[in-house]
Amino acid sequence: MNKSYLYSFFFHGSLVKRISVGLLLGLLLALIAPSLQGVLGFNLAEKAGFLGKIFVRSLRAVAPILVFLLVISAIANKQLGTKSNMKSIVVLYLLGTFLAALTSVLFSFALPTEIALKTQEGSLSPPNEVSEVLSTLVLNVVDNPINALFNANFIGILFWAIGLGIALRYASDTTKNVMNDFSEAVSRIVHFIISFAPIGVFGLVAETLTDKGLGALLDYMQLLVVLIGSMLFTAFVINPILVFWKIRRNPYPLVWTCVRESGLTAFLTRSSAANIPVNMELSKRLKLDEETYSVSIPLGANINMAGAAITITVLTLAAVHTLGIEVSFPTAVLLSVVASICACGASGVAGGSLLLIPLACSLFGIPNDIAAQVIGVGFVIGVLQDSTETALNSSTDVIFTAAVCWSEENKNS
């Protein structure tokens, strides 16, 4: 019975619980490894770090092709002919995502956070000016697509994926279905890799604490304060301001209702897609226009990614602060734009926002080896980060849909 329970837990149990167990076991191993070193002749926690390296390398391997196929599939299969007020909802989605990223920049500047990273001398070539960043950005955009995939040049990958996606919108349904199938296949591989996250987190935590000490946990706590603080500020300050702009009355009853009835469920499921039925039912109870919310809610689950933009921005700036790279405010605003674009491609993928961090890191000349370590840090704190991120993303879908619907009703009354 016990064996059956353990097997079910480790292979079919909640990912949140399994990652929590992996984190605690990694912490425990880091604490007892020094006392065992005299008996074993080596540091067991350092050896366990190999598990974390395998996990991070697997993520690095799948990330380029994942971004490439997902973006092509999403754009190629995008439906046209939506209602005119969808434009207002999409504007709110994109504006809210950008303002969330900008908020996280301000939080990161106010409370600079460093994380435990391993770097090699001479491995960095940080840009000095915004013009240099833009120059690098343009050159990366026009990279050869095969070369972009081979070198994990995510800017180039994104450019070619968008271009091919637009071109394939005029292809046959069979071709679009093939792209969908490839996208789904890679997503399944990602889900398989993510299922080993507890083992990877175990190795990452054990090695990090052995190498950097318990102080690394304090860095993660500060990182969580910046992350979750940015998300809470967005949920209860930025979003209400945007809602008030549309409906011209107290936005907080709507915000609290959506956070309570949509955000809580999303926090537990950690899936915007899984929360779509919940948001549909909530929209119905709010008596919103069915033709609008039936389109805007699924669309929001794919492009309304304020939480993901915050995650990408905060973790990227944490890496930047750790490496001692100087960042001007205009460059940080550019990062907010890039993070917002990245966030729109993070939907429907387990750990999607984390996998897109290398794209943002590339703006500052941070190599993929170090960016992959940042992804590993993201998985260590993912139990809280991913849940809060999803809660913000999903609840905002209903908030903005309701704001536009009520605004249209006010105009027509």
Swiss-Prot record:
Q: Which UniProt keywords apply?
A: Amino-acid transport, Cell inner membrane, Cell membrane, Membrane, Symport, Transmembrane, Transmembrane helix, Transport
Coarse class of the protein's main subcellular location: membrane
Q: Which domain of life is it from?
A: Bacteria
InterPro entries noted in UniProt: Na-dicarboxylate_symporter (IPR001991), Na:dicarbo_symporter_sf (IPR036458), Ser_Thr_transp_SstT (IPR023025)
GO terms for MF? neutral L-amino acid:sodium symporter activity
List the GO cellular component terms.
Answer: plasma membrane
Which chain regions cross the lipid bilayer?
Answer: 22-42, 61-81, 89-109, 148-168, 189-209, 224-244, 305-325, 337-357, 363-383
Localization annotation:
Cell inner membrane
Q: Name one GO biological process term.
A: serine transport
Q: Would I find Transport among this entry's keywords? A: yes
Membrane topology of the entry: Multi-pass membrane protein
Spell out the reaction equation it catalyses: L-serine(in) + Na(+)(in) = L-serine(out) + Na(+)(out); L-threonine(in) + Na(+)(in) = L-threonine(out) + Na(+)(out)
What does the function comment of this entry state?
Involved in the import of serine and threonine into the cell, with the concomitant import of sodium (symport system).
Q: NCBIfam families recorded for this chain?
A: PRK13628.1
Family, per entry: Belongs to the dicarboxylate/amino acid:cation symporter (DAACS) (TC 2.A.23) family.
- Stated name of the protein: Serine/threonine transporter SstT
Species this protein is from? Histophilus somni (strain 2336)
Q: What is the lineage of its organism?
A: Bacteria, Pseudomonadati, Pseudomonadota, Gammaproteobacteria, Pasteurellales
